[in-house]
Amino acid sequence: MDVNPTLLFLKVPAQNAISTTFPYTGDPPYSHGTGTGYTMDTVNRTHQYSERGRWTKNTETGAPQLNPIDGPLPEDNEPSGYAQTDCVLEAMAFLEESHPGIFENSCIETMEVVQQTRVDKLTQGRQTYDWTLNRNQPAATALANTIEVFRSNGLIANESGRLIDFLKDVMESMDRDEVEVTTHFQRKRRVRDNVTKKMVTQRTIGKKKHKLDKRSYLIRALTLNTMTKDAERGKLKRRAIATPGMQIRGFVYFVETLARSICEKLEQSGLPVGGNEKKAKLANVVRKMMTNSQDTEISFTITGDNTKWNENQNPRMFLAMITYITKNQPEWFRNILSIAPIMFSNKMARLGKGYMFESKSMKLRTQIPAEMLANIDLKYFNDSTKKKIEKIRPLLIDGTASLSPGMMMGMFNMLSTVLGVSILNLGQKRYTKTTYWWDGLQSSDDFALIVNAPNYAGIQAGVDRFYRTCKLLGINMSKKKSYINRTGTFEFTSFFYRYGFVANFSMELPSFGVSGVNESADMSIGVTVIKNNMINNDLGPATAQMALQLFIKDYRYTYRCHRGDTQIQTRRSFEIKKLWDQTRSKAGLLVSDGGPNLYNIRNLHIPEVCLKWELMDEDYQGRLCNPLNPFVSHKEIESVNNAVIMPAHGPAKNMEYDAVATTHSWVPKRNRSILNTSQRGVLEDEQMYQRCCNLFEKFFPSSSYRRPVGISSMVEAMVSRARIDARIDFESGRIKKEEFAEIMKICSTIEDLRRQK
């Protein structure tokens, strides 16, 4: 029988059906090929929005730069980046007036952070532009390479381990006339294999040093590498995102720390909180506006959308904001915070890999690297690409494009939120000095605006004034994409509000299912996702029970671990049946060993091993959780592990799940093909770090491991720890006098070696 899908909605209130309209089932779209075209679009668009600004040339790099600040007053409807400095400063002053001491206190908090942050903060984050190799690397490797190059160039402030000292090196490196870097390269030769007598390509890895002059070094230090944003749902076109190098990252981190501290104190800010906390914050603002509007006023809410938020923001404005926020603070603090926006005013966008060409006969493919775009004959390109290249050419230097205006995606989320909130703050009656007033919510580029007034004309006037105020600060509310409703129905950061928040369950759909970490983690993550959705997203008991059954089924098919008494034949079924037959208490077998599922919606919080422990045969317990069993992974099992799950929008979320170390928590081995590439040096570095860290963890088991607060190296910390432990063990009689003496001797030897180095 066919079911008419509209029948499903007859009894459902419209607002609860919202989640069915979201494009969140199935795989998200990924990008293929290079991001060069998208990056050129971004650069060209950004310049177009600021085109009536003033052109200048960077004296160090020769890059042409466009400065739209205090440019012509913006025109209606056209997105533009002509922010007015005095307006921004005034908005900041009013924000401070409504929140006395907010900037002062945030500065004090940030100063503490600045003095305590260690340089390993920069190892967080995934791909980072590595300026030494001129391509992307994992953050930890990029940082290590940077420090290695700094030290070989005599920049050693970073040895203290504090981030602020590393940044001193960055500052000094920019004054150097030349910087020497080591690059990895590959040599290929054809040789005859002795055994098979066939010709094979042999690859060897070489390292060579070369010098960058001041101009080349500055260009690299100011470069943001670009990539295509993957897995973006609900969009037809892809777009470019940026990843900055290590020189910029530390400075950005401190600016964002300050801005985060301010956002935490602002009731209109949707950052840095998330989830239920964010919903509570939003509900408060709505409640405030509704209670005040019950009798005499009407209240409307705009679900707002801004046109090209990043491309119209300007680092120079951020500099003005920081200058204001840090007034009366020590000089060193003001300087360190102003460097990030200054670097962003001089940034260069790397155009990525370039273009791929295929000949009509399909026999030949060739890549045109971005460096060649400046002077290649344009007859090979189609019209739209031709236009892009012509437009970007005056801005090109060494395959990077000068991009002074605009802020690439996701760099200053917190600080731009402060800017947005400062406009919402101006909606108080004491500032509007008329009958309408407004308030709202801001989270990076997303906003919701609530306007109250005695009549419709007042609402219109309020919205117009808000729109024009935004224009003066370089924010462009899109009249086409924003829509207005009676207060009580709006959407903000994909939360739908209808007299309270409606669970938008479709957004959680991608995180259901088997994650693919390993059998142990997947079981734990799967049930935790269901549990969390029962708590947060209106997942009802019947649906949750069904989700659980589907998950178990999915899990069994993924790991081919159907019940021991099933008829389904898989590669594992022979072994699993054997285990099933020789097990007395079959209920004690884990699902991944062909056991039955004992989960129901009441016990989702208990790890499966704990749930079944009492039911297990003794010898099964011994095999499953025996630390001497070579298959039990004890690499880094904490009682709580973190899984990265991908919700439908926003960044990947960290989700905690309980981890019990068993034979099922294996860690897969690295693919060997990397060993033959130029990445090999990187891999060797990584293994060296791994060994050092493992050694360090032996000295500081996790129970006693506190972040070292003093400024000492890992070696010093380990030596002093060894001495303390040896003394305790000697005095309690656990080790003999000779052993104690030997340990002390080794410690002294290590210290001598360090001094000689």
From Swiss-Prot:
Subcellular localization, as worded in the UniProt entry: Host nucleus; Host cytoplasm
Enzyme Commission identifier(s): 2.7.7.48
GO annotation, biological process: DNA-templated transcription; symbiont-mediated suppression of host gene expression; symbiont-mediated suppression of host mRNA transcription via inhibition of RNA polymerase II activity; viral RNA genome replication; viral transcription
Cellular component aspect of the GO annotation: host cell cytoplasm; host cell nucleus
Region called Disordered, residue ranges: 50-82
GO molecular function annotations of the record: nucleotide binding; RNA binding; RNA-directed RNA polymerase activity
Post-translational modification summary for this protein: Phosphorylated by host PRKCA.
Annotated RdRp catalytic domain residues: 286-483
Key words of the record: Eukaryotic host gene expression shutoff by virus, Eukaryotic host transcription shutoff by virus, Host cytoplasm, Host gene expression shutoff by virus, Host nucleus, Host-virus interaction, Inhibition of host RNA polymerase II by virus, Nucleotide-binding, Nucleotidyltransferase, Phosphoprotein, RNA-directed RNA polymerase, Transferase, Viral RNA replication, Viral transcription
Motif Nuclear localization signal: positions: 187-195, 203-216
Subunit architecture: Influenza RNA polymerase is composed of three subunits: PB1, PB2 and PA. Interacts (via N-terminus) with PA (via C-terminus). Interacts (via C-terminus) with PB2 (via N-terminus); this interaction is essential for transcription initiation. Interacts (via C-terminus) with human PKP2 (via N-terminus); the interaction competitively inhibits the interaction between the RNA polymerase subunits PB1 and PB2.
Highest taxon, organism lineage: Viruses
Protein name listed in UniProt: RNA-directed RNA polymerase catalytic subunit
Biological source species: Influenza A virus (strain A/USA:Texas/UR06-0195/2007 H1N1)
InterPro entries according to UniProt: RNA-dir_pol_NSvirus, RNA_pol_PB1_influenza
Record function comment: RNA-dependent RNA polymerase which is responsible for replication and transcription of virus RNA segments. The transcription of viral mRNAs occurs by a unique mechanism called cap-snatching. 5' methylated caps of cellular mRNAs are cleaved after 10-13 nucleotides by PA. In turn, these short capped RNAs are used as primers by PB1 for transcription of viral mRNAs. During virus replication, PB1 initiates RNA synthesis and copy vRNA into complementary RNA (cRNA) which in turn serves as a template for the production of more vRNAs.
Region of interest (Promoter-binding site), ranges: 249-256
Catalyzed chemical reaction(s): RNA(n) + a ribonucleoside 5'-triphosphate = RNA(n+1) + diphosphate
Family statement: Belongs to the influenza viruses polymerase PB1 family.
HAMAP family: INFV_RDRP (MF_04065)
